[in-house]
């Protein structure tokens, strides 16, 4: 196995550019709440990315939403390369209190063509250009199994404004990323055991209870050798994040979305590989939690791991069909 290694010169260059961008967010782009609200005409709704096969998937996802009683309006974001789906957008979608939002109607053509956005990068752009102030984002192949109308009237959402769900894989974001965003990690303070940040640390790490019996050097060696990086104070929580569903207050987390956009624009060059180290699922999925963490904005990631659904085709031949994520408010 190999460790992610980003030399100090590159780290410093990335840190400097990152700092300039976050300074811009807190300066020129630090819009007031009324200014942010004026950018979005809608109130609350559901957003998904369509276009091509994703519009076909969105068709079944939207029917499922209505079957479960969800009445929130829906916006399907259509990327530039997939415009022209008139029957879906103009005839079918309005029957389900939905409409299409075209990139080309909102984003000027030259910046859009210059950016050369790929699939992963389209999602955060879609979240920003949707007209709603508060959104439930769902991937087109994501099916709600309960009514989502009350999602915005929950304690967890009101406390944080950003709800995320865990992925299958452990978080492997390297120290280099934390150096770039200017976030310090306390290598002498363990705050969780994977996703469990409620139980006393001594329950899963007896060393902590007896730490006074050891020298400072021995304590440091213990944390460096035996404690995962993302169990330490100052890091993003384990597990890694999944972006197939998110609940976002775009007014409160306006800068979070802009920084996530920054990570995605420079994702193929730097941040996708850096944040996920080439593991399965590398892409936009961890850029949202990374942006909130970098800006010290509140967020809640569901602690309960997802479950698999599927069947055994033959003995010892399990066919996975779906992932089942948990109710975020019950988890909170």
Regions found by a protein language model. Give the residues of each.
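Glycosyltransferase catalytic domains, chiefly GT-A lineage
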Residues: 1-332
